[in-house]
UniProtKB/Swiss-Prot annotation:
The keyword S-adenosyl-L-methionine applies. This is 23S rRNA (guanosine-2'-O-)-methyltransferase RlmB. It comes from Pseudomonas aeruginosa (strain ATCC 15692 / DSM 22644 / CIP 104116 / JCM 14847 / LMG 12228 / 1C / PRS 101 / PAO1). GO terms for cellular component: cytosol. HAMAP family: 23SrRNA_methyltr_B. S-adenosyl-L-methionine binds at residues 198, 218, 227. It comes from the Bacteria. Its EC number is 2.1.1.185.
Length: 248
């Protein structure tokens, strides 16, 4: 499987089969697994004439980098968008633009969780710096539960410069910082927005911070001083979604 990427887990593989079936070369299932969730996968694979085989679970354990749920797919290399594609993504997106920029999130579990939350909140693209980010690997895909197959991940050479270009296009850049004067709930986030989240502990880099139009913090009522970056991202994104959702 060395020349192919591997994707594992029911949700991640199902998302691939539904959204990018041409990328899937082979579907492997653990011997003896015939439950309804696997039946859905085999039916999808059959519809696209994708071979389905069985392997001993211990062999799948060696292939996968984590809990595979008895499902592993061999796929062609994943697409990471370049910064020149941001304009196209914004042009074809519907509604008020909402982008997420992750400055220095290097843990694949955090990146996967952020992708999952971003998709749920309606984010059009997630932006990461090429040299300060986890890569789109099998662990990220598994944690993202299918979101990595549908939400564009844009890797940029210079995050500060990219934020400046987005500002010129009319987007407001909102960065998160624990020492900010205002809380996130005091900002009007209904307009075109880029939400910037920094790395745990270090926060945003200096140049990234300098390119933010606003800085905001999450109010903390307990004894801990901060949240996990993926949890904080979820809180921030769903506050933006709340502000943009009309009351019925």
């Amino acid at each position: 499987m060395s020349q192919w990427e591997k994707v594992y887990g029911v949700h991640a593989v199902e998302a691939l089969l539904r959204h990018h079936p041409k990328r899937v070369k082979q579907l492997w299932l653990a011997e003896g697994r015939h439950d309804p969730r696997v039946q859905v996968l085999t039916e999808l694979a059959a519809g696209f004439r994708i071979p389905v085989g069985q392997r001993d679970r211990r062999e799948l354990d060696e292939w996968a980098e984590g809990v595979h749920q008895g499902v592993v797919a061999e796929v062609s290399p994943s697409q990471v968008w370049g910064e020149n594609m941001l304009e196209e993504l914004l042009e074809r997106s519907e509604g008020v633009p909402l982008l997420l920029a992750l400055d220095g999130v290097t843990d694949p579990h955090n990146l996967g969780a952020c992708l999952r939350t971003a998709d749920a909140a309606g984010v059009q693209a997630v932006i990461v710096p090429k040299d300060k980010s986890a890569t789109l690997n099998a662990t990220v895909r598994k944690v993202a539960c299918g979101a990595a197959e549908v939400i564009p991940l844009v890797a940029v050479t210079n995050l500060a410069r990219t934020l400046e270009k987005l500002q010129q296009r009319g987007l407001w850049v909102v960065g998160t910082a624990g020492e900010a004067d205002k809380t996130l709930y005091q900002l009007d986030l209904k307009g075109p927005t880029v939400l910037v989240m920094g790395a745990e502990g270090k926060g945003m880099r200096r140049l990234t911070r300098e390119h933010c139009d606003f800085l905001a913090r999450l109010p903390m009522a307990g004894s801990v001083s901060s949240l996990n970056v993926s949890v904080a991202t979820g809180v921030c994104l769903f506050e933006i979604l709340r502000q943009r959702t009309p009351l019925e």
